[in-house]
Design a protein with these regions (language model features):
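Cross-family detector of peptidyl-prolyl cis-trans isomerase
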Residues: 2-142
Length: 142
């Protein structure tokens, strides 16, 4: 009985460990961009209004492509998303990660939480301090 009481705190600590918690966020140290297709059109720069298709996932270090749970996609909403590049109207990772893309280009953005939603997270889909993955296609520059 005494041995059981000694093991009980260890068991409770193991059960409360964040490694078993599905909502625990994984972060990465810096932004990474991977061009899937470079594109052949004009180059997006700060001040341009850009039109993109995108899909966003939580970063998963165990997945080969780091694409975890999908949380949003312009394709699910039936259209593109338009925003002024560099104006701070989207997350920092988008302002920095879309800049330099060519029209027709497709790029994967791996974003640390500080370039996404940081310690606040977003709604019920993006936990605090979560790294994000976005596949972005630059459709046009307006």
């Amino acid at each position: 009985m005494r041995r059981l009481l000694c093991l009980l705190p260890l068991l409770l600590a193991a059960c409360s460990s964040p490694s078993g918690n599905a909502s625990t966020a994984t972060d990465i140290p810096a932004m990474q961009t991977i061009d899937q297709t470079v594109g052949a059109g004009a180059v997006a720069k700060s001040g341009d209004t850009v039109e993109v298709n995108y899909t966003g996932w939580l970063y998963d270090p165990k997945a080969p492509d780091h694409h975890g749970k999908k949380f949003d996609s312009s394709l699910d909403h039936g259209g593109t998303f338009t925003f002024p590049l560099g104006a701070g109207q989207v997350i920092k990772g988008w302002d920095e990660g879309v800049a330099g893309m060519k029209v027709g280009g497709k790029r994967t953005l791996l974003l640390p939480s500080a370039m996404g939603y940081g310690s606040r997270g977003a709604g019920g889909d993006i936990p605090p301090n979560a790294a994000l993955v976005f596949d972005v296609e630059l459709v046009s520059i307006k």
